[in-house]
């Protein structure tokens, strides 16, 4: 067992080492270098680049680099791999939407939503699975948008989430979405949280 663990660590560091060039490019904001690297190494698009298991998609999302994220999506080998790429989770359990949700990049979220709809329509389950996915704390992307005070993002994502909305209303420690909005003094979002609650209850 110990040997297996050591071999696993070696493989992980070997993978990260191979992606050192785009990682350093990301640190320096050299997004064209990242684009160029993955144009030549498309099979590594979903490989982890950091010790926290961030892929290029995570990095593009939380760096608020819409053009880079669009470029990476277009480099995917086929449209059916889109869900897999966006659903890949890092150490914190965050997928790409969890990372986009913490920014004010509504246009980025809109691009991803439309891309998913274009690929999988009329089946909306792939999009819904991504929006309802919970990270290690039990947070959905909508919950994270509220927690980070991203009013427009929270509204946009909630408008595109269908079915049961209750999964967005709390996390593992029982902190409600309304409570987190008030604690962060995101009062506009506390109003949105009320609206979501009313929508859930059909009020």
Positions of PLM-derived features:
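Ankyrin repeat (ANK) tandem arrays and their immediately adjacent linkers/low-complexity segments
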Residues: 1-203
